[in-house]
């Protein structure tokens, strides 16, 4: 893995505003940082990133399967009771997800580890489609 430093787009703020990405800077700090990229070997991608990501996604789906079957778990996760049936019905119909983004930590020497998984969240539309 090799870290590559890049210049920020000179018109970043204007481009962000043009697509409604008004939170590119939050609390005086940049939320969106495009000054770093990473170059990987094929083995790193296949073995350390793609393989673990596939396994993690399967684990998340297993967890969701368990959660939607148990109203107490949905409540524990802060899901309003009024939404329980909607979520369970959507899951039972296998409605497709729009997108998902895994935030992984990877040191270049072993399998990536999951920090968080954002799927079908409003901000991800900007982060993974409109603004990239």
Regions picked out by a protein language model, each given a short descriptive name:
Residues 1-132:
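Preference for protein termini
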């Amino acid at each position: 893995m090799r870290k590559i430093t890049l210049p920020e787009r000179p018109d970043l703020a204007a481009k962000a505003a043009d697509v409604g990405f008004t939170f590119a800077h939050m609390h005086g700090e940049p939320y969106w940082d495009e000054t770093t990229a990473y170059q990987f070997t094929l083995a790193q991608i296949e073995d350390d990133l793609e393989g673990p990501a596939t396994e993690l996604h399967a684990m998340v789906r297993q967890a969701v399967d368990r959660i939607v079957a148990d109203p107490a778990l949905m409540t524990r996760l802060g899901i309003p009771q009024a939404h329980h049936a909607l979520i369970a019905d959507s899951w039972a119909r296998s409605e497709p997800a729009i997108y998902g983004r895994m935030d992984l930590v990877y040191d270049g020497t072993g399998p990536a580890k999951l920090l968080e998984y954002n799927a079908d969240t409003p901000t991800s539309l900007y982060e993974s489609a409109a603004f990239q």
